[in-house]
Every structure is written in structure tokens, then in C-alpha cells.
UniProtKB/Swiss-Prot annotation:
GO molecular function, one term: metal ion binding
Gene: znuA
Family membership noted in the UniProt record: Belongs to the bacterial solute-binding protein 9 family.
Name listed for the protein in its UniProt record: High-affinity zinc uptake system protein ZnuA
Region of interest (Disordered), ranges: 119-163
GO CC terms of this entry: periplasmic space
Signal peptide residues on this chain, from the entry's feature table: 1-23
GO BP annotations, alphabetical order: zinc ion transport
Function per UniProt: Part of the ATP-binding cassette (ABC) transport system ZnuABC involved in zinc import. Binds zinc with high affinity and specificity and delivers it to the membrane permease for translocation into the cytoplasm.
Segments of skewed composition (Basic and acidic residues): 119-129
InterPro entries assigned to the protein according to its UniProt record, in alphabetical order: Bact_metal-bind_prot9, ZnuA, ZnuA-like
Disulfide pairings: C280-C334
Keywords, sorted A to Z: Disulfide bond, Ion transport, Metal-binding, Periplasm, Signal, Transport, Zinc, Zinc transport
Domain of life: Bacteria
Length: 337
């Protein structure tokens, strides 16, 4: 009953929310906002839905978020597999105002599989964050592609199953190649909406591609001396970055950052730390897992921090390159010890 009331409230908000003046481009998560703001600079504003300090893995929409979706000039999201909190609102706005990255034909060949083989499912997860709620709803949506489809969700432990069941690594903002495609798509959409700013948008796109190429070259050189050093990350978010810049990830603690690994998994990780001479364990600012502190204490391995959302990076024209550089610096700070 509560679920039905929540869905009704969201639907009502979508139907009744007033159109706002000076609507912006809305990105589901901040790293997408870095790409968007680089292209939209001087054209229109950029907003991010998931606020600083929050994680898209467990985010719940507020009514004000629904209004932002409805009033935006353009919404950029990854897709319902990872941005599931946006599925309903996205289905109720015009598809020409939406970029669904998962649906972009040029992106699909570049997607990587989630590295489930590095996470050992032993059935003993530590459910400190337990989510028991059911979804049983149908919806039609038609966003950024030419067909409608209908699907039904009826499952428990949504965050756990939804993220751990994914076969694709959807942290696509860490792929420079995919980010270039997204930037081009944003430029195309903004040019259609703001034809008088066509030249500025084209220049922003050119600057984005040039800056990204220059920054990538610097990062590759910076990380060359630590490319053979093994490390564990808190959750499997960095595969695209590691592949792009030649880093050697030994493994990760969990697929879903809301679910801590169990005792058997931790015992196996400890063995791998010793066997592979792992140099670093990386935590994340959005989560403070005690398992990393415990392993570091018992193994004497270094501990660093990676921020897959880029909370400390400010949106702006060069923010995507700054975000990648910030990640590289965080790697170096620990791996170079």
C-alpha cells in the first residue's frame, strides 16, 4: 500500500509540477554532470540529481527531484539497469529531452562486463544495510529509442539483487571513449535546442575532446611507474579507468557497496593480498567499511581513498578532465608508497 501511495505521489508530481524558467540540463550523477557541463558551458546550466555525499546505489527521489526532471531542457542518465530510481520519471517525459547512455548504439560495443569472477559469492554477506521492499508495477516508456517496451518488477532486496545481478559494468563515466560519445550526443541535443549557440557548442565539444586527449596522455605517463602494483578497491567501479590507463586491479570487496562481504570472502581476500603482494586497499568517501580498516591492520597494507563520484570536483568546462586527474592522483598517493 505504501508503495502504491509513493508511485501515485510521483505520478502526481510529474503531472502537476510547474514548468520552471531557465531550465537546465540534468545529469543523474555528478560524473555525467562533468561531461554535460563541459559542453553546456555558456549555453545553459547543469544540475546533478544525486547530491554530494550520496550514492546512486541507494538514492531515493524527492518530489523536488521529480520537478527537476520534468522541467529540464535535457536529462542525461545511464539507464534503468543502474539509475533505477529515475525509471518512472524518465518514462513520462518526451524522449527528445532524454539521453539514455545504455541505448546509444556507439556505446554498446565499448561496454565491459562486471567482473563477478573477482568477487567470491560465499553466501555469507554481512547485511548491515538490508533493503526489504517489493516492486510490482508496469510501465511503458519510450526514451531515446524508437520502440516502447513493458516490463514488470517483482522482487525482494532490490538494491542487492539489482546491482549484484548486473552483467555489465555501468560506471561508464570512467571510460574516456564512452565519455566522448556522450559529449557528442549532448552537443547534438543542445544544438537542436539552442541553434543560435551552435558555434559555441561546437567549440565546447572540440575543447572537451582536446583537453581529454591531453589529460589522458599525462595520466598514462603519471601512472606508468605503478601499473604493475596490485590493489583492491571497495567496489567494482573503476574497470574502465584501469583499462584506459593500464592499471592492474587485483580485485574488489563487493559488487554492491550497500552489502559488506562476508567472513569467507574476507579470508580469501586476505590470502590474495599475501599471495599477490597487494600494495593498497582503496576505500570510498561515500562509505566507511570497517572491513578495509580490519584488513589493513592485519596485513600492514596501505590504505587509500578513491571517489567514483567526484564530490570535491566542481562542475565546469574542464571538470571531466579534472575528475580523471583527481582519480589518478588518488591512485598515485597510495600506490607510490
Amino acid at each position: 500500500m505504501k508503495k502504491l501511495l509513493k508511485i501515485s505521489a510521483i505520478s502526481a508530481a510529474l503531472l502537476s509540477a510547474p514548468m520552471m524558467a531557465n531550465a537546465d540540463v540534468l545529469a543523474s550523477v555528478k560524473p555525467l554532470g562533468f561531461i554535460v557541463s563541459s559542453i553546456a558551458d555558456g549555453v545553459t546550466g547543469t544540475q546533478v540529481l544525486v547530491p554530494a555525499g550520496a550514492s546512486p546505489h541507494d538514492y531515493n527521489l524527492k518530489l523536488s527531484d521529480i520537478q527537476k526532471v520534468k522541467s529540464a531542457d535535457l536529462v542525461v542518465w545511464i539507464g534503468e539497469d543502474i539509475d533505477s530510481f529515475l525509471d518512472k520519471p524518465i518514462s513520462q517525459i518526451e524522449r527528445k529531452k532524454v539521453i539514455t547512455i545504455a541505448d546509444l548504439a556507439d556505446v554498446k560495443p565499448l561496454l565491459s562486463k562486471a567482473h563477478h569472477e573477482h568477487f567470491h559469492e560465499d553466501g555469507d554477506h554481512d547485511h548491515d544495510h538490508k533493503h526489504e521492499h517489493k516492486h510490482d508495477h508496469k510501465h511503458d516508456h519510450d526514451h531515446d529509442h524508437d520502440h516502447k517496451h513493458e516490463h514488470k518488477h517483482d522482487h525482494e532486496h532490490h538494491d542487492h539483487d539489482h546491482h549484484e545481478g548486473l552483467t555489465t559494468n555501468w560506471h561508464v563515466w570512467y571510460s574516456p571513449a564512452i565519455s566522448k560519445i556522450v559529449a557528442q550526443k549532448v552537443a547534438d541535443k543542445l544544438t537542436a535546442q539552442f541553434p543560435d549557440k551552435k558555434a559555441l557548442i561546437a567549440q565546447n565539444l572540440s575543447d572537451f575532446n582536446r583537453t581529454l586527449a591531453e589529460q589522458s596522455e599525462k595520466i598514462t605517463a603519471q601512472l606508468a611507474n605503478v601499473k604493475d602494483k596490485g590493489f583492491y578497491v571497495f567496489h567494482d567501479a573503476y574497470g574502465y579507468f584501469n583499462d584506459a590507463y593500464g592499471l592492474k586491479q587485483t580485485g574488489y570487496f563487493t559488487i554492491n557497496p550497500l552489502v559488506a562481504p562476508g567472513a569467507k570472502t574476507l579470508a580469501h581476500i586476505k590470502e590474495e593480498i599475501d599471495e599477490h603482494k597487494v600494495n593498497c586497499l582503496f576505500a570510498e568517501p561515500q562509505f566507511t567499511p570497517k572491513v578495509i580498516e580490519s584488513l589493513a591492520k592485519n596485513t600492514k597494507v596501505n590504505v587509500g581513498q578513491l571517489d567514483p563520484i567526484g564530490d570535491k570536483v566542481t562542475l565546469g568546462k574542464n571538470s571531466y578532465a579534472t575528475f580523471l586527474q583527481s582519480t589518478a592522483d588518488s591512485y598515485m598517493e597510495c600506490l607510490a608508497k
